[in-house]
Amino acid sequence: MVAISLPDGSVRSYEGPVTGRQIAEDIGPGLAKAALAVTIDGTMKDLSVPITTDASVSLITARDAAALELLRHDAAHVMAQAVQELYPGTQVTIGPAIENGFYYDFARAEPFTPEDLERIEERMREIVGRDLPIVREVWERDEAIAYFTKLGETYKAELITGLPANEDVSVYRQGDWLDLCRGPHLPSTGKLGTAFKLMKLAGAYWRGDSRNPMLQRIYGTAWPDRKQLDAYLTMLAEAEKRDHRRVGQEMDLFHLQEEAQGAVFWHPKGWTVYRTLQNYMRRRLDLAGYVEVNTPMLVDRALWEKSGHWEKFRQNMFISEAEDKLLAMKPMNCPCHIQIFKQGIKSYRDLPLRMAEFGACHRNEASGALHGLMRVRAFVQDDAHIFCTEDQIVSETQAFCDLLKSVYRDLGFTEIKVKFSDRPEVRAGSDETWDKAEAALREATDAAGLEWTLNPGEGAFYGPKLEFVLRDAIGRDWQCGTLQVDFVLPERLGADYVGEDGDKHRPVMLHRAILGTFERFMGILIENCAGRFPFWLAPVQVVVATITSDADDYARTVLAALKAKGLRAVADLRNEKINYKVREHSLAKVPVMLVVGRKEAETGGVALRRLGGQSQEVLALDEAIATLANESVAPDLRAAPQG
């Protein structure tokens, strides 16, 4: 007998092996029609897989989040079939589901065109309409290599050759077409539906290695229904308008160029925002009891070897040689912070020691992976390491979570998701230590009022971690903050403190960041507010614009008064119509314009116009300046509301 436990707590018994499809049919015709896949003891499988032993089983339908990845993976296969039907001789390589969609890499002599994408998408709809059964087959390794080699599919043959010896070689057949794949897949192509769209073309090296041939990548997106597809396409259109590279150019914030790939040229306006954000973070950390340090950018390989980074991270480090020594530009700050901790004897009374650095780091990212401010080679982290005892992990984590929530709120992000990554299979430290660390993180996030989802086995080898994900104004998620518990690095680098018992002990090291890197967070911030920064962050807060040249002297007086109150202001005295000036400064996302003419000069007033507003408010100059000076105060410096 095979006992099948279902999510509702019921148990169904079968005489022998049973498939997910049979279980669905047994439950009812509605589920039999809707079922797409099955999870067996937590692992997703095809509906056709026999279940031979007692198991916990859940049937997956289009309503389940897990179905989305399945849907997108199948879309990649249907696209590959369409390409090979339309363009014989094209080789297929790898085609996974990714966030919000899928892609497939093709080897083809002729480049694909946008018109080709339309043809491929139309053929995909035909293949869906055929409702071809998708059938899994297991082949002998030599048979599979010979088959794909004969077809001229050299990339597939290479993939099979590289599979572990104990792994099945599985292929999935859709009608006469088949592909190498681990699966799982939908029961038939018809289950994919037609809520998909091919998005763009790109180049990609085979296996991501620039020494290998360049392939053609086709990206697409797929959703359970047309409504969700349309919502996603609308979001993409809005995201294009908000693209930080586009907005950054329009607002003259920064630029990037080939001669310094992965590094940012900050213009005066962009650097103003950057420094304002950094000063805000510096004040928040100072108030939270952090000490700020600065460590060398070039560090001898010997330290990186001791820390383990040389072995695990060397390919991503920029290396320089000086006087027969190899020096690396630091990719992170943690080993250097331990060197500061080790200077002098530390007592348990010195803990927790919260050490922060706006550290300039460099990582040798592949040029193809670089993307505006979001993925760079040269960056500054809002990095800190908390040296504490095991008993202080809970309180320090809770304090960090509270600080993080407050910072995100000040910067306009109120939706925060937390991912909790627990112990991986390969790890350092005892189970007892891991139990304590994981329990401490759970307790701290609960105390901070943060809901979390589990990422099983995704912790670092040295300890569990939390990842903090922000949702922006158009519904996209961005992983920014992190907190990692580390028992290993203090041991490797010889950090210790004298405990209350007079003996030496290893501190626990909490690696933590709120923004992540300033560069990436600036990109996220620009896109979240579409360049309309909150008033306290805006690079230019006020423009004083004249209607006629008669008001030029008065405009200069207004400008001086604004600057005297610390406002970032400029005057526009050009001989242009006021509507032209309003339009130009609105496009530059300046939050406030003070319009002055002969009348305002005579009365000592200003006409205050806010960005996006259709009207203006006439105020006395002193009143306008007092209002704007109050609005320009950073959130952390504002007086707490009374009562």
Curated annotation (Swiss-Prot):
Assigned keywords, A-Z: Aminoacyl-tRNA synthetase, ATP-binding, Cytoplasm, Ligase, Metal-binding, Nucleotide-binding, Protein biosynthesis, RNA-binding, tRNA-binding, Zinc
Location in the cell: Cytoplasm
Reactions accelerated catalytically: tRNA(Thr) + L-threonine + ATP = L-threonyl-tRNA(Thr) + AMP + diphosphate + H(+)
Annotated coiled-coil segments of the chain: none
Residues at which Zn(2+) binds: C334, H385, H511
CDD domains: TGS_ThrRS, ThrRS_anticodon, ThrRS_core
Keyword RNA-binding: yes
Record InterPro entries: aa-tRNA-synt_IIb, aa-tRNA-synth_II, aa-tRNA-synth_II/BPL/LPL, Anticodon-bd, Anticodon-bd_dom_sf, Beta-grasp_dom_sf, TGS, TGS-like
Root EC class: ligase
GO cellular component, as recorded: cytoplasm
SMART domains: tRNA_SAD
Any one GO BP annotation for this protein: threonyl-tRNA aminoacylation
A GO molecular-function descriptor: ATP binding
EC number: 6.1.1.3
Cofactor binding annotation: Binds 1 zinc ion per subunit.
Top-rank taxon: Bacteria
Ranges where the record places region Catalytic: 243-534
Ranges where the TGS domain occurs: 1-61
UniProt subunit comment: Homodimer.
Family named by the database record: Belongs to the class-II aminoacyl-tRNA synthetase family.
Cited function: Catalyzes the attachment of threonine to tRNA(Thr) in a two-step reaction: L-threonine is first activated by ATP to form Thr-AMP and then transferred to the acceptor end of tRNA(Thr). Also edits incorrectly charged L-seryl-tRNA(Thr).
Name of protein: Threonine--tRNA ligase
Organism, scientific name: Rhodospirillum rubrum (strain ATCC 11170 / ATH 1.1.1 / DSM 467 / LMG 4362 / NCIMB 8255 / S1)
